[in-house]
A protein has these predicted regions:
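NAD(P)+-binding Rossmann beta1-loop-alpha1 motif at the extreme N-terminus of oxidoreductases
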Residues: 1-36
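Rossmann-like NAD(P)(H) cofactor-binding subdomain of soluble oxidoreductases
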Residues: 17-18, 35-109
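Short internal beta-strands
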Residues: 26-30, 120, 251
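Residues at the C-termini of beta-strands that transition into short coil/loop
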Residues: 29-31, 75, 97, 114, ...
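Internal alpha-helical scaffold of NAD(P)-dependent oxidoreductase catalytic cores
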Residues: 63-64, 83, 87-92, 109-210
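NAD(P)-dependent Rossmann-like dehydrogenase/reductase catalytic/cofactor-binding core
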Residues: 191-290
Length: 290
């Protein structure tokens, strides 16, 4: 099986490690031309890029993917599936989530809290669904836990509860998941983000109890205690974050469903401000004010 990995960050490296020696891998990032002359198409494409890169990934997949091939997105947040489906057709796109803590060390080596667990639903079309099954088998052979579900949206919203609770708070307070659990301000804030996200999920048709949502993020926080969230890593590195696709998307979906989500909206603004470049003018203003 020929598999493209679109986005070579930590999750891309993790998936590549699982598939190494089991599939013919094509690594694609923004520095590589998506299709070289004479290059074969791929049977499957795994989208592991951050949300801002999804339109790019959709364009690359459209050029690389075999007509009977499948695209599997295991990205964070909302909106990625729709972007891919609009470009490639819903019948070829599989939606899933991954649970793992991972980061690339300065020397380029991979740190992860484990092999990773994926929950995903196959696409509707027969050919892409068969390729999805083959890909799931290869990932399992590489040590990943892969659960195939009929409806991906409960998995998406449950992962979103954890992301919405932990990612912005760890970024705001500069702490690991374990440190967040013990933080006198951060932990209650994450609890409220989880409760609010559960209310929005229920409004969107995925019933999640508020107490269940709180227990969910806390359980993941304990399991992946040493992990530094991807949003914390992005803020520390001065990279764009996925705040709009996570807390921003929760707030927007809440507005659409008539479910207020003011804490998610506030966190979206705070992390966006935290991520703004601080140039010489900002430094000069700070010095003048001091």
């Amino acid at each position: 099986m020929r598999v493209a990995i679109l986005g070579m960050g930590a999750i891309g490296h993790l998936v590549a490690r699982a598939l190494d020696g089991r599939a013919a891998l094509v690594f694609v990032d923004r520095t590589r031309a998506p299709v070289r002359e004479g290059e074969r198409h791929v049977d499957a494409a795994l989208v592991t890029t951050k949300t801002p890169g999804t339109p790019w990934a959709a364009d690359v997949a459209a050029r690389l993917l075999d007509p009977e091939g499948v695209v599997l997105t295991i990205q964070n947040g909302l909106g990625n599936y729709e972007t891919l489906a609009q470009r490639l057709g819903r019948e070829r796109v599989a939606l899933g989530v991954i649970y793992v803590g991972a980061a690339l060390r300065p020397d380029g080596s991979l740190f992860s809290t484990g092999p990773g667990a994926i929950e995903a639903a196959p696409p509707a079309a027969d050919g892409p669904a068969r390729r999805f099954g083959e890909l799931a088998t290869l990932l399992r052979a590489g040590g990943m836990r892969v659960s195939v579900v009929a409806d991906p949206w409960p998995s998406v919203w449950r992962k979103l509860v954890a992301n919405a609770a932990m990612n912005p708070t760890t970024a705001l307070f500069g702490c690991t998941n374990a440190e967040l659990l013990a933080h006198p301000a951060g932990a209650p804030l994450a609890d409220e983000l989880a409760r609010e996200t559960a209310r929005v999920a229920s409004g969107a048709g995925v019933a999640i109890r508020e107490d269940e949502a709180v227990a969910m993020w806390r359980r993941i926080g304990e399991t992946l205690g040493a992990n530094r969230s991807s949003m914390l890593q992005d803020v520390a590195a001065g990279r764009p974050t996925e705040i709009d696709a996570i807390n921003g998307a929760v707030a927007s979906e809440g507005e659409r469903r008539g479910v207020p989500a003011p804490v998610n909206r506030a966190m979206t603004l705070l992390v966006a401000a935290l991520s703004e470049p601080r140039g010489e003018s900002a430094t000069a203003e700070s010095a003048a004010a001091g």
